[in-house]
Amino acid sequence: MECAGDSWDANADHDVLLDPVLLRRSAKMYLNGVDPHTPLASPLYADLRGLPPLFIQAGTREILLSDSTRLAHSAHDAGVDVTLDLWDGMVHGWHYAVSLLPEARAAIENIREFISFHTTQEK
């Protein structure tokens, strides 16, 4: 919600799905004057202890990459079993191109494997 991080600037010209200006405007409207550091507005500032296993995927070319890595580190520090699955060269929402990109199909397969592993009775 604070719309900050290295990837906001570094990937602004690469991420074709997310517009930093529009996202900042949307965050401001959503927050309606509330501090963006409020845990209910952003999990980056929440107490993550006790969360179930967490799977985070991000593309290295998306503007939300910094948020994704920060969330993964915070979750890890809180004792959460977290998997950060980074995809080189991908922008936000590359999964939508499942019929075009082998990376999208592979990413979705990683999601399936994570869910299957964590929902199987015997591990």
Residue ranges, per PLM feature:
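Alpha/beta-hydrolase superfamily serine-hydrolase fold, recognizing
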Residues: 1-123
